[in-house]
Amino acid sequence: MAKAKFERVKPHVNVGTIGHVDHGKTTLTAAITNVLAKVYGGVAKDFASIDNAPEERERGITISTSHVEYDTPTRHYAHVDCPGHADYVKNMITGAAQMDGAILVVAATDGPMPQTREHILLSRQVGVPYIIVFMNKCDMVDDEELLELVEMEVRELLSEYDFPGDDLPLIQGSALKALEGEKEWEDKIVELANALDSYIPEPERDIDKAFIMPIEDVFSIQGRGTVVTGRVEAGIIRINDEIEIVGIRDTTKSICTGVEMFRKLLDEGRAGENIGALLRGTKREDVERGQVLAKPGSIKPHTTFESEVYVLSKDEGGRHTPFFKGYRPQFYFRTTDVTGDVQLPEGVEMVMPGDNVKMTVTLIAPIAMDEGLRFAIREGGRTVGAGVVANIVA
């Protein structure tokens, strides 16, 4: 059985380094791969190969990101590191690199700096659930009291953004010294790895979450009823399951009387699979692209939300001019566009291409959404921005 085979594989956890420029994020990333390769086996990566991050395009947005992997005895980690601040902003907002937890790097020589704060705020907005702190460059600070002061500052800053600042793990170390092979500092990297293992819970697999499938297409089959097709985003749908059809119109209920894939009938459809679901008693005209099939009660339709948005630069194919409050583009959620009205924060008069901004959006039709849902902003089919739902208002 395929499932039994999968269980032998270590749980897979996605993490990343965040923090102010030049505080040592990339050096730490290199140190983790080197020390853990030495201690637990695996492949070491040097600073230059991580720092020379390849450019990727996610939804038309250019992002430079380095991906490294490492293992602890119980887990396999995929770790992202970005060279520039703008890359972090884009990465976190588009969800190109979903993080189950982040390692916040703060130089003990500087303490928290503007981007430290900005990355913590972004983590809160986009729903990074856990943060572990690595205080770097501690070999350069002789004064024990100064280290305590910086630790206190970092913890207070995290608490300010609703992270458990007093309780989360904070490791004082030196990424450079660990990379140079000094045992005392290498041990701090192992301590960091242990903190990742113990503090970040094993992420729930998509298949174990509540069932949801965005509807891509609808057609009727003579004598059998209405079939909706799409890719199962999470969970499992089985024959005779009750489901809700959510978004755009009033929520309705139906029963799934059949699941098919490549014209073969199945007992169930699982996360990641492209399926057709046959719905009992649902008419072809009652369902449309852009709605979702979902486990009853698991997701609600909403029209108004606060979001964190990155606006594409002109070079990325975005707008050439700024926009102002009352801007009415299309918001593309999962499989469909819905027009929405934009309100900007107090004191923000206009938004320039290349900016990131917090905005409140009111859609003209409700969409099934939870906090953390990603969307694109489009004008006439062209993507001009990317965003994430930070807070649902109504």
UniProtKB/Swiss-Prot annotation:
One of its GO terms (molecular function) is translation elongation factor activity. Transmembrane segments: none annotated. It comes from the Bacteria. Residues 19-26 are annotated as: G1. InterPro entries: EF-Tu_GTP-bd, EF-Tu_GTPase, EFTu-like_2, EFTU_2, G_TR_CS, P-loop_NTPase, Small_GTP-bd, T_Tr_GTP-bd_dom. CDD domains: EF_Tu, EFTU_II, EFTU_III. Its EC number is 3.6.5.3. It catalyses: GTP + H2O = GDP + phosphate + H(+). Disulfide bonds: none annotated. Residues 174-176 are annotated as: G5. Keywords: Cytoplasm, Elongation factor, GTP-binding, Hydrolase, Magnesium, Metal-binding, Nucleotide-binding, Protein biosynthesis. Monomer. HAMAP family: EF_Tu_B (MF_00118_B). GTP hydrolase that promotes the GTP-dependent binding of aminoacyl-tRNA to the A-site of ribosomes during protein biosynthesis. This is Elongation factor Tu 2. The lineage of its organism: Bacteria, Pseudomonadati, Pseudomonadota, Gammaproteobacteria, Alteromonadales.
